[in-house]
Amino acid sequence: SFKAYGGEILGVAGIAGSGQKELCETIAGLDRAVSGDIIFKGESIRSLTPRDIIKRGITMSFVPEDRLGMGLVGEMSIIDNVMLKSYQNLPGIMMDRTEGRKVADDIIEKLEVATPSPYHIVKKLSGGNIQKVLLGREINLNPDLLITAYPVRGLDIGASYLIYDILNEQKKKGVGVLFIGED
């Protein structure tokens, strides 16, 4: 049992196979809790689907461990991945291409993504750059809770520090950050 609050980073660590990833997926509504409850802003979300969570105005973002399986669509460009995610927050319409380009450019600049353009295909990026695009896309949604599963796994030290800095910026903005890791 634990409580996470806005403006703080809560770390959950454990050995491989101890259930951290499942915890993330359950809180994000991607898996069902077997027991217990998940209370978000005073409301139980245990039985809600991700779509129901969005409909209730509950804003949380999930940065999964599997960057190209559950995170980004590898065959699509950076801009298309940014625009695709925006669809869930806009009633019935997608972000237009101009706005998508602006957001993608901001993510590329702020997170120092090494890419020739926002139209670059995601699967051609390095693992660290894919992680930066994924994190940038999620924080662009201005969540109340940002759930991250192993956000620095496999990244070089420079990329890891940048990710830590971005997570600390989110904390300073009042976002609750749930950081799942092994150490």
Q: Residue locations for each model-derived region?
A:
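Glycine-rich phosphate-binding loops of nucleotide-dependent enzymes
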Residues: S1-D183
